[in-house]
Amino acid sequence: MQSSMLLRVRALPKTASVLSRTKTATYATYKVPRIDNEPNKHYAAGSPDRKALQEALARTQRNAPLSVPLVIAGKEVKSSSSLTQSNPASHGPVATYSNATAKDVQAAIESALEARKSWASTPFADRASVFLKAADLISTKYRYDVMALTMHGQGKNAWQAEIDSAAELCDFFRFGVKYAEDLYAQQPVHHAPGVWNRVEYRPLEGFVYAISPFNFTAIGGNLAGAPALMGNVVVWKPSPSAIASNWLVHQILLEAGLPKNVIQFVPGEAEEVTKTVLDHPDFAALHFTGSTNVFRNLYGQISTRVAAGKYRSYPRIVGETGGKNFHLIHKSADIRNAAVQTVRGAFEYQGQKCSATSRVYVASSIADSFLEQVASEAKSLKVGPPSDFTNFCGPVIHEASFTKLAKVIDEAKNDPELELLAGGSYDSSKGWYIQPTVYRTTNPDHPLLTRELFGPILVVYAYPDATEADFARIAQKIDATGEYGLTGSVFAQDREALAVANDVLRNAAGNFYINCKSTGAVVGQQPFGGARASGTNDKAGSGNLLSRFVSLRSIKEEFVPTYKVAYPSNEA
């Protein structure tokens, strides 16, 4: 089944008329291709896909470090200073990249603003085609290259790179087109006699600032791509730990036909780039994924400037940040399923997903069996470089993360409320490696049950379960513990228990899972995001997110003229 889309078409010859001088002269109904999720490849031993990916990994390694410039005014710019993105599995260089100065950022902003009028008036059919083409390029020509850069640069194994930099990135671009089509189709449903009412979804007046994280290549593409799809111009600052893959995504968009100055690519020191952006009066929106503390700081900086009347418009602020995501396991749960899902949720990509499982509350009556399986599975996970396909876990992203997590492990050795069940070791001799670590705590208020760690450390508490009231109480404890509200899962076969958890935990997670892990949201299936300290919950992978990057204009046109000033009620 295909769906209709209202598209602006260049149909009139160029004359002196106003209509013919724009790209919005006529309207026609089109149909976009059917949108489906990108099929996953599995990279089994001996498969052609594994061979192709291994070749891309070897080629990327031979060509390292990749030299990444700034892209300003459609031109590649080498700055006077450069920085290095390191491979977290080896400490070797993945890319050297230009470090944007305040002057560079100012030039990027001005270039973006110059492109705004042309891009904003480009028919949606043309804008949509860029992103559909980019998705096809990622799916085919560049699939293994973008995966290889993600694996080398961000420490993901083959499967994690596949579901991120290949599949999810394609899904963001394709479903974005579908959601934009649906948004544009939302028009007034009633028209008085002789009146035509309509709504125009205008791009924001100014530019969008996209700050992307290290942990998902797809998020980088979406943070810059979603506003651009809606006709906005973007200044994109990628994470210093994801430069190589993000650079390739930008190049793919250009190859797909994106005008070169619509998205400005400006890697650099966060403080200097951000200050220059936020000081500009045409700053129109922030699109952010990263830490809660950084987002709060940015929110405050923007608010201060709003209070001072700095901006032309009130900036939109869209952010997805951290989480302290839970698994709640009822005594009726399938224990094996709960254990396997917990190990996957906690240790896939070394626990560096904002949705990663980091705290578990399990019924005491099944705790021993559950913990035995979790500990056994955690101990069996192979840890090492992603280029070895047998490794389930790779390195954590950088030295700062490694140091923080190693300190947690060291401090836990002297904590009487923690029992080490698996892991508890680390190694930085070649790469930043933390063994998958599981603790059992006797304290339901232990700090490790509230503090976001962003690494492969899982803490489990066994709660009393003599009565069903105990289950409701532990659900209330989860809801009241910690400041986040991103993801969470409940495991139970008892439907009444599921109903209790669903009700009590209604605000504890923006993505709530039943009998499955707290990670793995799929574009087009589970829109992603949370509230509380986890962000603005605008739901990546949904039409709601796109609505944040348009400014509506209501238009009323009357076809019947009015010739009398007085109303009937004014008559004598």
UniProtKB/Swiss-Prot annotation:
Keywords of the record: Mitochondrion, NAD, Oxidoreductase, Proline metabolism, Transit peptide
Broad class of enzyme this protein falls into: oxidoreductase
Pfam families for this protein: Aldedh
Site feature (Transition state stabilizer) residues: N215
PANTHER family xrefs: DELTA-1-PYRROLINE-5-CARBOXYLATE DEHYDROGENASE 1, ISOFORM A-RELATED, DELTA-1-PYRROLINE-5-CARBOXYLATE DEHYDROGENASE 2, ISOFORM A-RELATED
Name this protein carries in UniProt: Delta-1-pyrroline-5-carboxylate dehydrogenase, mitochondrial
UniProt catalytic activity: L-glutamate 5-semialdehyde + NAD(+) + H2O = L-glutamate + NADH + 2 H(+)
Cell location: Mitochondrion matrix
SUPFAM superfamilies, alphabetized: ALDH-like
Organism phylogeny: Eukaryota, Fungi, Dikarya, Ascomycota, Pezizomycotina
A single BP term in Gene Ontology: cellular response to amino acid starvation
Source organism of the structure: Emericella nidulans (strain FGSC A4 / ATCC 38163 / CBS 112.46 / NRRL 194 / M139)
Pathway: Amino-acid degradation; L-proline degradation into L-glutamate; L-glutamate from L-proline: step 2/2
Source organism superkingdom: Eukaryota
GO cellular component, one term: mitochondrial matrix
Active-site positions on this chain: E320, C354
